[in-house]
């Protein structure tokens, strides 16, 4: 069995589509099968943070997702995301992503939309990569997904 290699770009693209595209291109050249970004709303997770302007700039909007997904498709590398709110999952679904990722912070069930996001992902019956890096309730997550 061949390993499926994911280039974890997350939010490390400085809010610049050109930087994100360069990272996607380099990931493809390095042999990655997929690139993975994070799709969250700054207002949900970082309200009042001292670095608000920097954080807000790194937010992956629907328009940016579409641009990066189209670019990834053109290069022949899979694009997917950790979606942090239900509408992000719906939008990713409309673009035809093949899989989703549950972020570890979503698995802790402490984010504002954790349960709704997990339920939405489950409804699409696609492969899900689950991160338990921050803990979380493995049994509860399995139950929701099944």
Language-model region placement:
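N-terminal small/glycine-rich loop or linker at the start of catalytic domains
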Residues: 1-13, 46-48
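Hydrophobic faces of well-ordered beta-strands that scaffold small-molecule active sites
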Residues: 5-7, 35-37, 79-82, 100-102, ...
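Conserved, mostly hydrophobic/aromatic
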Residues: 8, 27, 92
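Active-site beta-loop-alpha junctions enriched in small/polar residues
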Residues: 10-12, 40-42, 84-86, 103-105, ...
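Catalytic domains of carbohydrate-active enzymes, especially glycoside hydrolases
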Residues: 22-41, 95-96
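Glycine-enriched alpha-helix->loop->beta-strand junction motifs that scaffold or abut catalytic
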Residues: 31, 91-100, 122-128, 146
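Glycine-rich, proline-tolerant flexible connector loops at the mouths of alpha/beta enzymes
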Residues: 33-60, 109
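Active-site-adjacent beta->alpha loops and helix N-cap segments on the catalytic face
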Residues: 59-65, 102-125, 134-145
């Amino acid at each position: 069995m061949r390993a499926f290699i994911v280039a974890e770009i997350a939010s490390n693209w400085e809010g610049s589509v050109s930087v994100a595209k360069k990272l996607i291109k380099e990931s493809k050249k390095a042999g990655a099968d997929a690139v993975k970004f994070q799709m969250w709303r700054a207002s949900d997770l970082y309200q009042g943070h001292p670095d608000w302007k920097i954080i807000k700039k790194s937010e992956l909007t629907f328009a940016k997702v579409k641009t990066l997904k189209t670019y990834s498709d053109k290069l022949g590398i899979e694009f997917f995301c950790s979606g942090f709110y239900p509408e992000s999952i719906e939008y990713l679904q409309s673009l035809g992503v093949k899989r989703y990722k549950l972020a570890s912070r979503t698995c802790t069930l402490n984010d504002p939309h954790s349960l709704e996001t997990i339920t939405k992902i489950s409804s699409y019956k696609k492969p899900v990569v689950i991160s338990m890096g921050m803990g979380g309730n493995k049994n509860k997550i399995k139950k929701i997904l099944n």
